[in-house]
């Protein structure tokens, strides 16, 4: 969740879209439109990506999260973690991240970015919502297993490679 919020909101120290990520794209010869360039004033610039939010889009997105009200005990007050002036979200507890990912992110993203960006993120939210549901049928797991590679491929076409944190899961015998 940190990678998603940090990158969408371009939060300092949290975003996975930075100069190094863009230089990696250049080295891999991927997405030339996103390669950094140096202007006449010798400053390096990063072209806007499809997931780059404008100030208004950030404000609209965060306003939804700030204004959301949930029943007591459902989650902590997410609005306390939203900083509208700084356009950041921080201090979320683990359960709040789950609620944000599974329930609130799809609502907050509507109307902010293009369908190309929003749809895979909404599907990822749906994946986590389904996999964490109280009841799961084998057919549901089969559907989810078939769908997740497609979702990840769509996300790989949108976000830079550094966006994807690699987790090592060790099996204990």
Task: Give the role of each language-model region.
Residues 1-173:
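A structural signal for the principal folded core domain
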């Amino acid at each position: 969740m940190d990678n998603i919020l940090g990158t969408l909101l371009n939060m300092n120290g949290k975003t996975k879209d930075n100069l190094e990520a863009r230089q990696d794209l250049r080295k891999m010869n991927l997405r030339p439109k996103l390669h950094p360039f140096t202007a006449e004033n010798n400053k390096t610039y990063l072209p806007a990506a499809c997931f780059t939010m404008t100030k208004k889009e950030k404000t609209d997105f965060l306003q939804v999260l700030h204004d959301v009200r949930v029943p007591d005990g459902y989650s902590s007050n997410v609005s306390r973690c939203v900083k509208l002036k700084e356009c950041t979200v921080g201090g979320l507890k683990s359960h709040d991240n789950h609620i944000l990912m599974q329930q609130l992110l799809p609502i907050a993203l509507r109307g902010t970015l293009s369908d190309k960006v929003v749809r895979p993120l909404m599907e990822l939210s749906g994946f986590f919502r389904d996999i964490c549901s109280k009841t799961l049928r084998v057919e549901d797991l089969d559907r989810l297993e078939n769908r997740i590679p497609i979702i990840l491929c769509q996300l790989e076409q949108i976000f830079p490679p550094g966006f994807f944190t690699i987790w090592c899961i060790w099996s204990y015998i």
